[in-house]
Amino acid sequence: MEKFTTYTGVGVPLQRSNVDTDQIIPAVYLKRVTRTGFEDGLFSNWRQNDPNFVLNTDTYKNGSVLVAGPDFGTGSSREHAVWALMDYGFRAVFSSRFADIFRGNSGKAGMLTGIMEQSDIELLWKLMEQTPGLELTVNLEKQIVTAGDVVISFEVDPYIRWRLMEGLDDAGLTLRKLDEIEDYEAKRPAFKPRTNA
């Protein structure tokens, strides 16, 4: 997993609340057996049926920092929702409230979910409306987002923050203990069952 310390990308204002995982990626797109290629399903109902949807505009179609309304990622636990956002190009999502499971899935996959006050979310929306294509700089170490001269703080779970800054997914966490695992396996009695790769 790629380390996340600072990142700059075009901010995308998603001025909708209660965006659930089925709206992020409908179930029809969940039949794939790979972990990539889900970007075509991202917000597909809105992208296909609303020509004015934010990701259908030239200004925001290549955005990578999503600023969403409250209660983002609610609904069923669907890792595909995180994968779709990441496959599209998003590195960070900010909201005043996230579903806990969505936040956990995001952190494990390498995407930052930062919590801001709703008034700060609305300030970012206003700034992005005034300056379409505004770049947002996310500093995970300092837990701030910079938009022009405006600096806004955000919260993130300390453990997820550490994992993102270290670039550690679940496999990476296990590999940090590889010496101890190999030492244990070497000392384990030969008559006990083993799994071979």
Curated annotation (Swiss-Prot):
Say which enzyme class the record assigns. Answer: lyase
* Metabolic or biological pathway, per its Swiss-Prot or TrEMBL entry: Amino-acid biosynthesis; L-leucine biosynthesis; L-leucine from 3-methyl-2-oxobutanoate: step 2/4
Q: Name one GO molecular function term.
A: 3-isopropylmalate dehydratase activity
What reaction(s) does this enzyme catalyze?
Answer: (2R,3S)-3-isopropylmalate = (2S)-2-isopropylmalate
What Pfam families does the record point to? Aconitase_C
UniProt keywords (A-Z) are: Amino-acid biosynthesis, Branched-chain amino acid biosynthesis, Leucine biosynthesis, Lyase
Name a GO CC annotation attached to this entry. Answer: 3-isopropylmalate dehydratase complex
GO annotation terms (biological process): L-leucine biosynthetic process
Q: What induces this one? A: Repressed by RipA.
Q: Give the top-rank taxon of the lineage listed in the UniProt record for this protein.
A: Bacteria
EC numbers, comma separated? 4.2.1.33
Q: Which InterPro entries match?
A: 3-IsopropMal_deHydase_ssu (IPR004431), Aconitase/3IPM_dehydase_swvl (IPR015928), AconitaseA/IPMdHydase_ssu_swvl (IPR000573), IPMI_Swivel (IPR033940), LeuD (IPR050075)
Signal peptide residues on this chain, from the entry's feature table: none
Subunit comment: Heterodimer of LeuC and LeuD.
Q: What is this protein's function?
A: Catalyzes the isomerization between 2-isopropylmalate and 3-isopropylmalate, via the formation of 2-isopropylmaleate.
Q: Record's family?
A: Belongs to the LeuD family. LeuD type 1 subfamily.
Q: Specify the protein name.
A: 3-isopropylmalate dehydratase small subunit
Instruction: Give the organism the record lists.
Output: Corynebacterium glutamicum (strain ATCC 13032 / DSM 20300 / JCM 1318 / BCRC 11384 / CCUG 27702 / LMG 3730 / NBRC 12168 / NCIMB 10025 / NRRL B-2784 / 534)
**Gene name?**
leuD
